[in-house]
Amino acid sequence: MEAEDEYSAGCSFSLMCQEDSTDLDDDGGGGGCFAGDGRADLLLVYNAAAAADDEDEEEVEEYMDHLVSKESSFCSSSSSTSSSSCCFSDAGGESAAAAAPMDWFALARRATVKWILETRGCFGFCHRTAYLAIAYFDRFCLRRCIDRSVMPWAARLLAVACVSLAAKMEEYRAPALSEFRAGVGDDGYEFSCVCIRRMELLVLSTLDWRMAAVTPFDYLPCLSSRLRRHVGGGGGAGASAALIFSAAEAASVLDHRPSTVAAAAVLAATHGALTREALESKMSGLSPSFLLDKEDVFACYSAMLSQPTSPASKSTTTTTGKRSSSSSCSESTDAASSYDATAASFPAAASCGSKRMRLELPGGILR
């Protein structure tokens, strides 16, 4: 047991680059966004947006052009396949694409995304870490076949590996693999350190080791600042984050570009429900050189507002579609805490299951 514990403790760092911690620990050892309740990254969004007001316009343009260029390069190779063509098979080996609609996969994916968000709250990860983990999961599912018969636990194992890899990419201190517990009640699973590490390597090889993707959270500071300067508003980073994750829970994050998701989230969080004409008018103030597909933004925006968990869909709007300032402030606060509230129940669910299954990755399950 002691040997296994020592091995488990070292596994979380086996895939990490050796970096100089002096470049990372700018907060005097506070642990960055790893510590606390996970809202430090939202504070950074507010601070960055405020600082952007005083920055040279050309620098902001250059930064956003860089993001768009990186995003375009990444999307062209990572999401050339539609999410509707995911490769899954049922217990009898029949292709799910030729069978009935994959409601079972939609349910499994939704449960996986919820678990990733709960885990983010439990460990205090920044929002970008959670979004990257979801993106890894969706990209993996485009390239690998998963048997339906093993989907519940195979999807959870994949989620653990994706969260672990995302944490190693983004967090100052990544948890040891032994710290990840994917249990839910008495039906939970406890994966060995070796099993998680194997899945990590499978994810890395499947994604061609391209892990540093652009996310909607990279755009939020600039978009929020621009929206505030040109058309008013632009705050509500918490509401924007909740909208982004609400959309990620409902459909693959590969369905829309990160810039599209960020623009839709900022507009929905700031203005609530708008007509198409009003939305396009607000979009014109985001950036003259920021090439946004209006059709795509409107589709993503509408999808966000249609989700029952969306904070913007619950808002009370005036006839012109604008929320009152008091309503906006209240909902922004609620949205900022909606995805952190599950952290209180997650540790209990992860530790109370007395009936655990210790699973190793069998051959032939993922191919």
From Swiss-Prot:
One of its GO biological process terms is: G1/S transition of mitotic cell cycle
Q: Which GO terms describe its molecular function?
A: cyclin-dependent protein serine/threonine kinase regulator activity
Lineage: superkingdom:
Eukaryota
Xref: SMART domains: CYCLIN (SM00385)
The record's annotation in Pfam families points to: Cyclin_N
Q: Which residues cross the membrane?
A: none
Signal peptide range in chain numbering: none
UniProt keyword annotation of Disulfide bond present? no
Tell me which Gene3D superfamilies the record gives: Cyclin-like
Q: Which UniProt keywords apply?
A: Cell cycle, Cell division, Cyclin
- Got a GO cellular component term for this one? cyclin-dependent protein kinase holoenzyme complex
Region ranges (Disordered):
307-333
Q: Which family does it belong to?
A: Belongs to the cyclin family. Cyclin D subfamily.
Q: Kindly provide the name given to this protein in its UniProt entry.
A: Cyclin-D5-1
Which organism is this protein's natural source?
Answer: Oryza sativa subsp. japonica
Recall the taxonomic lineage recorded for the source organism: Eukaryota, Viridiplantae, Streptophyta, Embryophyta, Tracheophyta
